[in-house]
From Swiss-Prot:
NCBIfam families named in the record: PRK13678.2-3 (NF010220)
Alphabetized HAMAP family for the sequence: UPF0473
Protein name: UPF0473 protein CPE1777
Coiled coil: none
Entries under PANTHER family matching the protein: UPF0473 PROTEIN CBO2561/CLC_2432, UPF0473 PROTEIN CBO2561_CLC_2432
Family of the protein in this entry: Belongs to the UPF0473 family.
Source species, domain of life: Bacteria
Length: 84
């Protein structure tokens, strides 16, 4: 786990704020991803991609593409294996 990344707060569609711990950041095929774990729920990990919104600002969007999820899982497994 990359401990030098600070927790982030995300706001859902209903305006509810949730704090997430950053498990790690991955750069895959010129795209940037964050693996996030809701605070207090270390067994849950959510993959988010850095995207630009309509104003050109960087924001996070959930990864829903099965191919991208598989790439992220493989990259994370490789990273985890290297840390052991």
């Amino acid at each position: 786990m990359n401990n030098d990344l600070q927790p982030i707060v995300l706001v859902d569609e209903e305006g509810i704020e949730t704090t997430f711990n950053v498990v790690t950041k991955l750069d895959i095929e010129e795209k940037e991803y964050f693996l996030l774990s809701p605070e207090g729920e270390e067994d849950v990990v959510i993959a988010m991609q850095v995207v630009q919104d309509e104003d050109g600002e960087e924001t996070l969007a959930p990864v829903e593409n099965d191919f991208e999820i598989e790439m992220i899982e493989e990259a994370y497994a490789t990273l985890f294996a290297e840390e052991e």
